[in-house]
């Protein structure tokens, strides 16, 4: 559910071979290194168990059954298999959501527009009265998977096998698409001018200008306006994705070039960068005046807003214009051409399969118990070798307290903040923890230390990580779905482009991006009878503007106070507008309004992440936020200071530099487990595999490592 940024989406349609299996996609992203951690390829680090644990029996908790938590479980399973006889790992997974796949029970799938969940990976099964034979699936979270997401495909390979088939996701621009912005209407597929209805479209021109200004050229002349180490970002992306780049080049990117770029541009918004690029292009004459009527300033603003709605062809970034250029550059450097769908009916199956594989690879030495409990507080408690403590409430609000050797907190930042902030930031002789403000029973702990312990003596150091987590920006996001007959696209009033009906719409109607996605539910090899109509996929302010129409949210089945039909009709109404197409003498009612109205009444559905318990869609850095995000990303390096005896680790896309993507959640899970291995081995990084060591020693430590412990951390 993250931000799709594909500068090459429209331009390189035929350059790269389309992957048809999980294994082919896995090879596409196996080498990629991110600029914040350029010294390590995460898929390579995860190719084998991350390291070894000392012999013994471990009791470990994972809080959260989403992608980060289950990936951490899988890695713990591989570690368990390496333990000697008589040793093992007992994992307790805390997951409060009754609809989680971890609590799968008869009846859940029978709920009309709700399905099983794996954290924010969730789907809604749509059926016409018979849940055993669904009509289509609404992929609420995690609906598409970039080819360069090497760790995602690594785990997909574990879950499904390399031979499992995959399909290209029908992104705007990959399928015939219509773009509507003010008086501007474009139909296109790809970015070759001959594949645009208007080869001289200002939309296509501003796309090329902004892509060049932000990305530049992979070879030849440097043209980007925001270079990294005086070269185009496209050239840096090529190094990061090379199979065998020079080690010194990667080190320079991570330790010099990328930090310099951050220092220079972390205070610059994406919107300001786009305006500067457009202004320079206009002054050079690359972009002409608009209609010869608007003056210079208004022409520049027109182009800035035009790109703001169009983006790189998959939907605009205007709602994200306040994010930092640094955050956008991370996504630009994550350079790819295609996104795919998985070989599943619903994407929750990916996480469920990985959960089952974790227990298989554990070779009988991994024991897993799932607890349907809500974790309210965490702390260290006890005298010497203080153990990690979790206080939780079950579905009847009975209080429970458990001690663990280690805890991985695998929940988004808005959920984590109250869990880790209640016990304060320094040692206390005794504390009463729990949700006393809700009138619930509490529990008394003695000799209490903060859960995210970074110092024995500095409350400010301990507060720093908690406040950093609390200040991360959570982007607002929402989706509105409906079900249509696939044959509806064959009606004569649905326009065609290049011999196919329009299947994606990007517009300023308030709906933002709209997709028609064929159902994964098919019979006897026939074409799917139904398709999911993602009527609206919005971010930030676009999402906020729709919220008053959502009725009973975040999930909107029919109720007495607000019906799904009433909610959906407001979406249809937004598309009722007059549009004038090229060559037409008059504006006519927009055909898309008619397609939206074709949807089945019973299956209209909205999911708004901001009003969901996750409190938002995905982490995204605003200007200045890099310093919070990066501290969270490096948090696991506290394990190098074994004498600190911190037993907590964090794992979520929120604590990565790829907020909203499974790849970010998986990366943070690897970080957490690598840190756990080092901590279990008293700071000895040689316990990690050679490939996994940069996960810890390749990053700047979040704590000062005492001189006596420094040798083992080298």
UniProtKB/Swiss-Prot annotation:
Record field: temperature dependence: Optimum temperature is 45 degrees Celsius for the oxygenation reaction and 65 degrees Celsius for the oxygenation reaction. Stable up to 70 degrees Celsius.
Phenotypic consequence of residue 479 to A: Reduces catalytic efficiency 200-fold
EC number(s) stated in the UniProt entry for this protein: 1.13.12.9
Keyword Lipid metabolism annotated: no
Cofactor detail note: Binds 2 FAD per tetramer.
Effect of residue 537 to A: Abolishes catalytic activity
Alphabetically ordered keywords of this record: FAD, Flavoprotein, Monooxygenase, Nucleotide-binding, Oxidoreductase, Zymogen
Post-translational modifications: Proteolytically cleaved to yield the active enzyme. Cleavage of the linkage between the 2 subunits causes reshaping of the oxygen channel and the hydrophobic environment around the flavin ring. Removal of the prosequence causes opening of the amino acid channel.
Catalysed transformations (reactions): L-phenylalanine + O2 = 2-phenylacetamide + CO2 + H2O
Activity profile over pH: Optimum pH is 6-9 for the oxygenation reaction and 10.5 for the oxidation reaction.
Residues that coordinate or bind substrate: 144, 537, 660
Effect of residue 143 to A: Reduces catalytic efficiency 10-fold
Residues annotated as binding FAD: 2, 68, 95-96, 120, 141-144, 375, 652-653, 660-662
Recorded GO MF terms: nucleotide binding; phenylalanine 2-monooxygenase activity
Cofactor: FAD
Record's function text: Catalyzes both oxygenative decarboxylation and oxidative deamination, depending on the substrate used. Has high activity for L-Phe and L-Tyr, but relatively low activities for L-Met and L-Trp. L-Phe is mainly oxygenated and L-Met is mainly oxidized.
Record-stated family: Belongs to the phenylalanine 2-monooxygenase family.
Subunit structure comment from the entry: Heterotetramer composed of 2 alpha and 2 beta subunits.
Protein name stated in the entry: Phenylalanine 2-monooxygenase precursor
Source species of the chain: Pseudomonas sp
């Amino acid at each position: 559910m993250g931000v799709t940024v594909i500068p090459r989406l429209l331009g390189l349609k035929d350059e790269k071979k389309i992957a048809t299996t999980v294994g082919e996609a896995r090879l596409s992203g196996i080498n990629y290194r991110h600029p914040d951690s350029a010294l390590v390829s995460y898929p390579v680090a995860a190719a084998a168990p991350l390291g070894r644990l000392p012999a013994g029996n471990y009791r470990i908790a994972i809080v959260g059954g989403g992608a980060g938590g289950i990936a951490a479980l899988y890695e713990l399973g591989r570690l368990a298999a390496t333990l000697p006889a008589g040793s093992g790992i007992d994992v307790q997974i805390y997951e409060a959501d009754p609809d989680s796949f971890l609590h799968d029970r008869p009846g859940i799938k029978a709920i009309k527009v709700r399905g099983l969940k794996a954290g924010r990976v969730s789907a809604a099964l749509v059926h016409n009265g018979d849940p055993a034979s669904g009509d289509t699936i609404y992929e609420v979270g995690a609906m598409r998977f970039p080819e360069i997401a090497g760790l995602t495909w690594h785990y997909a390979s574990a879950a499904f096998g390399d031979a499992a088939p995959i399909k290209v996701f029908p992104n705007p621009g990959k399928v015939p698409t219509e773009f509507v912005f003010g008086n501007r209407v474009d139909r296109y597929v790809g970015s070759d001018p001959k594949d645009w209805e208007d080869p001289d479209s200002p939309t296509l021109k501003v796309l090329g200008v902004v892509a060049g200004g932000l990305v530049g050229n992979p070879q030849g002349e440097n043209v980007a306006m925001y270079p990294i180490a005086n070269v185009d970002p496209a050239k840096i992306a090529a190094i990061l994705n090379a199979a065998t780049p020079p080690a010194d080049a990667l080190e320079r990117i991570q330790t010099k070039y990328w930090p310099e770029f951050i220092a220079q541009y972390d205070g610059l918004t994406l919107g300001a960068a786009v305006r500067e690029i457009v202004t320079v292009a206009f002054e050079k004459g690359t972009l002409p005046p608009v209609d010869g009527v608007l003056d210079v300033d208004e022409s520049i603003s027109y182009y800035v807003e035009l790109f703001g709605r169009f983006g790189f062809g998959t939907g605009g970034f205007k709602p994200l214009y306040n994010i930092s250029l640094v955050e956008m550059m991370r996504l630009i450097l994550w350079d790819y051409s295609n996104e795919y769908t998985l070989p599943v009916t619903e994407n929750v199956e990916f996480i469920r399969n990985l959960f089952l594989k974790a227990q298989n690879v554990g070779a009988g030495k991994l024991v897993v118990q799932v607890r349907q409990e809500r974790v309210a507080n965490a702390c260290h408690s006890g005298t010497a070798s203080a153990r990690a403590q979790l206080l939780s409430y079950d579905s009847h609000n009975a209080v429970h307290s458990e001690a663990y050797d280690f805890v991985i907190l695998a929940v988004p930042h808005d959920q984590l903040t109250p869990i880790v902030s209640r016990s304060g930031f320094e040692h206390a002789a005794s504390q009463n923890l729990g949700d006393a403000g809700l009138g619930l029973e509490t529990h008394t702990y003695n000799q209490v230390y903060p859960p995210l312990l970074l110092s024995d003596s500095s409350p400010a150091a301990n507060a720093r990580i908690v406040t950093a987590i609390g200040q991360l920006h959570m982007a607002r996001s929402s989706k509105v779905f409906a079900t249509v007959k696939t044959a509806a696209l064959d009606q004569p009033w649905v326009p065609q482009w290049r011999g196919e009906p329009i299947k994606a719409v990007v517009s300023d109607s308030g709906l933002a991006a709209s997709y028609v996605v064929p159902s994964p539910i098919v019979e006897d090899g026939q074409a799917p009878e139904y398709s999911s109509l993602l009527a609206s996929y919005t971010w930030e302010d676009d999402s906020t503007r729709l919220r008053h129409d959502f009725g009973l949210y975040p999930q909107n089945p029919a109720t007495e106070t607000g019906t799904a039909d009433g909610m959906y009709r407001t979406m249809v109404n937004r598309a009722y507008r007059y549009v004038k197409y090229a060559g037409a003498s008059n504006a006519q009612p927009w055909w898309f309004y008619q397609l939206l109205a074709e949807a089945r009444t019973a299956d209209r559905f909205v999911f708004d992440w901001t009003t969901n318990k996750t409190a938002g869609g995905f982490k995204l850095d605003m200007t200045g936020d890099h310093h919070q995000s990066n501290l969270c990303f490096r948090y696991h390096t506290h394990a190098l200071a074994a004498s600190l005896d911190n037993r907590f680790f964090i794992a979520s896309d929120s604590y990565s530099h790829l907020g909203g993507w499974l790849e970010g959640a998986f990366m943070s899970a690897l970080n957490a487990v690598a840190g756990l291995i080092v901590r279990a081995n008293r700071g000895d990084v040689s316990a990690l595999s050679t490939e996994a060591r940069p996960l810890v020693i390749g990053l700047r430590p979040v704590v000062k490592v005492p001189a006596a412990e420094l040798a083992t951390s080298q």
